[in-house]
Structures are given as C-alpha cells and as structure tokens.
From Swiss-Prot:
Belongs to the class-I aminoacyl-tRNA synthetase family. TyrS type 1 subfamily. GO terms for cellular component: cytosol. Homodimer. Keywords: Aminoacyl-tRNA synthetase, ATP-binding, Cytoplasm, Ligase, Nucleotide-binding, Protein biosynthesis, RNA-binding. This is Tyrosine--tRNA ligase. SUPFAM superfamilies: Alpha-L RNA-binding motif, Nucleotidylyl transferase. SMART domains: S4. The keyword ATP-binding applies. The lineage of its organism: Bacteria, Bacillati, Actinomycetota, Actinomycetes, Mycobacteriales. A motif ('KMSKS' region) lies at residues 230-234. InterPro entries: aa-tRNA-synth_I_CS (IPR001412), aa-tRNA-synth_Ic (IPR002305), Rossmann-like_a/b/a_fold (IPR014729), S4_RNA-bd (IPR002942), S4_RNA-bd_sf (IPR036986), SYY-like_C (IPR054608), Tyr-tRNA-ligase (IPR002307), Tyr-tRNA-ligase_bac-type (IPR024088). PANTHER family: TYROSINE--TRNA LIGASE, MITOCHONDRIAL (PTHR11766:SF0), TYROSYL-TRNA SYNTHETASE (PTHR11766). NCBIfam families: tyrS. A motif ('HIGH' region) lies at residues 40-49.
Length: 423
C-alpha cells in the first residue's frame, strides 16, 4: 500500500511531509485513516480545493480511509490572510455554507460500509461545546506564542495593520481538530495545501503532547500556471466555483479547454486519474500536434464530468460545437445556450432598439464601428445562428430568435457574441 506515495511523487503532488520513511512504513502496514479540512468561507468550494480533495480520493483508491472535515467552527474564525481581517459571517450563514460544502465534498470520495468508506465530520460538533476555560487549559497551554508569532503570515500582518486574537488563535482550533479525529477515528495523517504546513504541523505536535501518539503531515503544492498565476481564477478574476449556479458547467469546461500547452500535462497529472501511459501519449500529442488541443479537450472533459457529471459534459460539448458552426444550435436547451453566450458577450435588443446587423455587431463588441462591421460582412466573415450574412442591411425576423429571444453572432471562426431580445 505504500505505493500511494510513489504515485503521488510521480504526479508531483507532495510538497512537504513529516518523516517520509515512517509514513511509508505505516502505510505499508495496513489501511490508514487520513483527513483534510475545508472551511466554509463561501457558499461553494472552488477549483483550488481540487488537489487535496482528489488526493483524498487517491488514498481511498489505494485502500485507505478518508475523512472530509467541514470547518463549521474554523469557518467562523478564518485562517489569517496576508492582508486584512476576514469579514465574520453569522453562525447561520456559516452553517448553511457548511451544509452546501458538505454535499460537494461527498462527490469526490466513496461513502459505503467498507473499511475504506469515507467519513464526513464537522468540527463545530466538538469546538462548539468547548468552553473558554477548557480551550485555554486543554489546547492553549501547549502552544508557544513565540512560535506562533514566527509564522510568515502572522509576521507580515504584525508588520502591517496587525492581527486580531480571533484569527491569531485559528492555528489552535485546527490543531485540536487533529486531536479529536485521532481520538474518534484513529486518524494518522492530515493533508492540505502547502500554505497550511504550519497549522498541520501544529496539530501533529499537539497530538504527540496530549495523546503521546506519532501522526503524520503532508502537503500538496499550491497550483500556479507556467506564468506563476494562481490556478482556478476565471477570466473575470473571480474564483472558479464547483457550484454550477456560481460557475456554469460551460464556463468550467472553457476554463480547462483554454489551458496553455505549457500547463496542460501537469494539470492532467494533478487533476485526473489517467495512467502514465495515456499521459505520455497526451504529452506527445501536445508537443507534436499542439493545434489539435487533444490534451486540453481531455482535461476539460475529465474535470467537467468529475464535478458536474456526464450529462453536463455532453451538453457543454454540444454547445461548444454548435456555437462554432459544428453542430445544430436549435438543438441546445435554453439554459445551456444562455450560459454559453454569457461567457462571451451579450447585448440586449429592445423593441425600439436598432436591429441592423451592423448595429448588433457594434453593440456586442464584435466590431469597433459600423464601417468595420460592413467590411467584415463584405468579406464573408459574419454569421448569425451559423448562417452567413451577405447583406449589411440584414435585420432579424421573429423566426430567427432561438427559444424566442437569442441570436448567436460570430465574426470569423472564433469570435462569438449573443443578442438577447427583451420585451
């Protein structure tokens, strides 16, 4: 069973760990229980959470038992950031977010009655019952303020606007989670992003001091692209959310299909379960035939199916093909069509608004001016609903609107925009 570490190594998924030999020996001795925690600081998890989530799944597939911990308590405090205090949410809001995130967590690991069946916990169940006196005596007594002040994030905050005691104490709450999971489930390994190393190691020490047990810590790398930009940010700069109401399956798919050649093979290693042989073939295809974007299509398909399911992936792929003239637009359901167009640009068309094709091209941003629009039409570079427009006097008829209110405009091969008729 220790081969899980070899698997993680070749995928580049181990950033730091405590005693590697001891961890390997314990993994080889039999099934291990491990956990990773996820704080409900928003209504949904985002793409940045995928690495630790999928690492839990890899351990489960290797015969170990994962615990997914929803941070109903720690989410009310917030891990210190480099700049600024977090806005404290109400208990009801955090509880609602924790329930939503718990549902998302359950998609990534298998829950059954087997020895490797996953467990879901919420740290509010033990932290909420902890009195101030108990917290200070049973947890705080084991922590040196000098060590806590030496954390990079804390040090940067102290050099700036300072840090509240609330956020300063976050490390203690997370460390106590490890103690509780060790006592309840025999948990012996915590995994998380490399920015959590200090908190995780604090838990390892607290388990040793309070229970006399040796447990382990391992972190995964924080994912950036080849230009050093943070992974999982949408084109608008916001997070790429797992909740389809916050990031549509179409937007999710498009993010991954637009992955740079320099990043796609690494992303396939980190975010999919493809074997080395197939990854090698995709790496070769990217090197020798980059214009085909074979690896990007596989990445987008794998991750959309993982997060949203096979039906959503099929709908998204049909939408992508139809938008770019390789499928039937009328066959798309309206939610999929609307979501796809909103990832491009949508202009509204009112009953009194100008509806000449040149006006629509300018309104959607596909042309800089009516003159430019006329030139593009004359060159045969404009289509509406995948039908080429030959006249700059063209106006839409009622029958042209998909689902009674949508037009799909395209300039050239890849520039797409939408027009939405409003009444």
């Amino acid at each position: 069973m220790s081969s899980i570490l070899d698997e993680l190594d070749w995928r580049g998924l181990i950033a730091q760990s405590t005693d590697r030999d001891a961890l390997a020996a314990e993994l080889a001795a039999g099934p291990m229980t491990l956990y990773s925690g996820f704080d409900p600081t928003a209504p949904s998890l985002h793409a940045g959470h995928l690495v630790p989530l999928l690492t839990l799944r890899r351990f489960q597939q290797a015969g170990h038992r994962p615990i997914v911990l929803a941070g109903g308590a720690t989410g009310m405090i917030g891990d210190p950031r480099d700049t600024g205090e977090r806005t404290l949410q109400t208990a009801d809001t955090v509880a609602d977010w924790a329930d939503r995130i718990r549902g998302q967590l359950e998609r990534f690991v298998e829950f059954d009655e087997s020895p490797t069946g996953a467990i879901v916990e919420n740290n509010l169940s033990w932290t909420g019952a902890l009195s101030t006196i108990e917290f200070l005596r049973d947890v705080g007594k084991y922590f040196s303020v000098n060590v806590m002040l030496d954390r990079d994030t804390v040090r940067r905050r102290l050099e700036g606007e300072g840090i509240s005691y609330t956020e300063f104490s976050y490390m203690l709450l997370q460390a106590n989670d490890y103690v509780q999971l060790r006592k309840r489930h025999g948990c012996a390994l915590q995994i998380g992003g490399s920015d959590q190393w200090g908190n995780i190691v604090a838990g390892v020490r607290l388990v040793r001091q309070k229970l006399g047990d040796t447990v382990h810590a391992m972190t995964t790398p924080l994912v950036t692209d080849s230009e050093g930009k943070k992974f999982g940010k949408s084109t608008g700069g916001g997070n790429l959310w797992l909740d389809p109401e916050m990031t549509t399956p179409y937007a999710w798919y498009q993010y991954f299909i637009n992955t740079a050649d320099a990043d796609v093979v690494n992303y396939l290693r980190w975010f999919t379960f493809l074997e080395a042989g197939e990854l090698g073939e995709l790496e070769e295809a990217t090197r020798d035939r980059p214009h085909q974007r074979t690896a990007q299509r596989r990445l987008a398909r794998e991750l959309t199916t993982l997060v949203h399911g096979e039906d959503a992936t099929r709908s998204v792929e049909h939408a992508s093909q139809a938008l770019f003239g390789r499928g039937e637009l009328a066959a798309l359901d309206e939610p999929t069509l609307a979501a796809a167009l909103r990832e491009a640009s949508v202009a509204e068309l009112t009953p009194s608004g100008p509806d000449l094709i040149t006006d629509l091209l300018v309104a959607t941003g596909l042309s800089a001016s009516k003159g430019a629009a006329r030139r593009t039409i004359a060159e045969g570079g404009v289509s509406v609903n995948n039908v080429k427009i030959d006249s700059d006097e063209w106006t839409p008829q009622a029958s042209d609107f998909l689902h009674g209110r949508w037009l799909v405009l395209r300039r050239g091969k890849r520039n797409i925009a939408g027009v939405q008729r409003v009444r």
